[in-house]
Swiss-Prot record:
Protein family membership: Belongs to the UPF0229 family.
UniProt xrefs under InterPro entries: UPF0229, vWFA_dom_sf
Organism of derivation: Pseudomonas fluorescens (strain Pf0-1)
Feature: compositional bias, Gly residues: 92-107
Full protein name: UPF0229 protein Pfl01_5140
Region (Disordered): 83-108
Superkingdom as given in the UniProt entry: Bacteria
Any single Pfam family the record assigns to this protein: DUF444
Stored NCBIfam families: PRK05325.1-2, PRK05325.1-3
């Protein structure tokens, strides 16, 4: 059997188009594997790609071979077993494969094809048909962190920072400046000596005087040092304020009796999006999970999403706990503070004004951005309208949106985190 397979080597990134075509061809397999990986992974475990397995029967390469179809009339000389007109059965095909049983001595099989997709490709399939905003990281004033940058040339510095090229250039210029007149005089004397030797070879007195002058000028030139401390040039490095690269994300979720499991799942997917955005913009991220009903508690991720604890609804308990944690562990001059709150909007009516006061006076002045998503198909209640007043006071750092179904998550996320033009 003859096979024709393209195995030509490709330079760096020259097979990108082929890889993209391959990903499009097996998009259903890859998307299914990514969905399974997302359900299996932790919210913070999005740092790598994923291994994708595709059944061997789906990835057969196009080949040229002798087909086994059709009928032929052939004369076989010396045949003693068959007569004209009889049909010869086809030889059986290979019986390779996998599964329990005894080993065979013939046939061929093919394992599943396994390949790795990158983190970028993983996120592309995870957020298919979506476009995460490219946000510019905000600089923090009063930061205590700095980075060292080049700031030109200095005449003083550490020997390890010497600029050899600039030093030699300076030394060459100094030597020319200090010995330029002597070199010009030396050239004139040498020309005169050459003329005398050519035209008046018997004039020994003048020739000796010129030779003595040449020695004197050469000695003067040689006394100019090749390198002087004045010539030394150093790379100047200065400290430049560097924005803090640490961020903390507070995830606040209502787990009262009115929050169904479907509502919690929508909240989880929103929190994953927010976490990935922060991870791409900051070197260090802390995630603080706060669950609340009538009271609030800081919990781990497992309990945050899967605990069955429930009760009434007092949203202010979560905001008070968040403010306490900020004061104890996350000073605003060192940390970029973000918050995402998810709720179905149900709250004790007398508590909604308290939530507004806590946010305006104790939280909003210290956070980079605060988002509130209300997951409900119903009309808004008192909490939403109190938060609207906060949005008016902090239009640049507070945003609220409504989610009705999982299909609303990504459009709402883009709306909340779209790039804003700075004027």
């Amino acid at each position: 059997m003859s096979y024709v397979i393209d195995r030509r080597l490709n330079g760096k990134n020259k097979s990108t188009v082929n890889r993209q075509r391959f990903l499009r061809r097996y998009r259903d397999h890859i998307k299914k594997a990514v969905e399974e990986a997302v359900s299996r992974r932790s919210i913070t475990d999005m740092e790598h790609g994923e291994q994708i397995s595709i059944p061997g029967r789906d990835i057969d390469e196009p080949v040229l071979h002798h087909g086994r179809g059709g009928k032929q009339t052939v004369v076989h000389p010396g045949n003693k077993e068959f007569t004209a007109g009889e049909h010869i059965a086809r030889p059986p095909g290979g019986g390779g494969g996998r599964g329990p049983g005894k080993a065979g001595n013939s046939g061929e099989g093919m394992d599943e094809f396994v390949f790795q997709i990158t983190q970028e490709e993983f996120l592309e399939f995870m957020f298919e048909d979506l476009e995460l905003p490219n946000l510019v990281k905000r600089n923090l004033t009063g930061t205590d962190t700095f980075k060292t940058v080049r700031a030109g040339i200095s005449n003083e510095g550490n020997p390890s920072r010497i600029n050899i090229i600039r030093t030699l250039r300076s030394a060459h210029a100094r030597r020319i400046a200090l010995s330029g007149s002597s070199r010009a005089k030396l050239r004139e004397v040498k020309e005169e000596l050459a003329r005398l030797k050519r035209e008046e070879p018997d004039n020994f007195g003048d020739i000796q005087d010129l030779e003595a002058e040449i020695e004197r000028l050469s000695a003067r030139i040689h006394r100019v040092p090749f390198l002087d401390t004045f010539d030394l040039k150093y790379n100047l490095l200065v400290k430049q304020p560097n924005p803090s690269s640490k961020a903390v994300m507070f995830c606040l979720m209502d787990v009262s009796g009115s929050m169904t499991q479907a509502t919690k799942d929508i909240a989880k997917r929103f929190f994953i999006l927010l976490y990935l955005f922060l991870k791409r913009n900051y070197d260090k991220i802390d995630v603080v999970f706060i669950r609340h009903h009538t009271s609030a508690r800081e919990v781990d991720e497992e309990e945050f999403f899967y605990s069955r604890e429930t009760g009434g609804t007092i949203v202010s308990s979560a905001l008070k706990l968040m403010q306490e944690i900020m004061a104890e562990r996350y000073p605003s001059n060192e940390w970029n503070i973000y918050a995402a709150q998810a709720s179905d909007g149900d709250n004790w009516n007398d508590d909604s004004p308290i939530c507004r006061d806590i946010l305006i006076n104790q939280i909003m002045p210290f956070v980079q951005y605060y988002t509130y998503v209300e997951i409900t198909p119903r009309e808004h209640q008192a909490l939403w309208y109190e938060y609207e007043r906060i949005a008016e006071a902090f239009s640049d750092t507070f945003a609220q949106q409504q989610l009705v179904s999982a299909g609303d998550i990504y459009p709402v996320f883009r709306e909340l985190f779209q790039r804003r033009l700075v004027t």
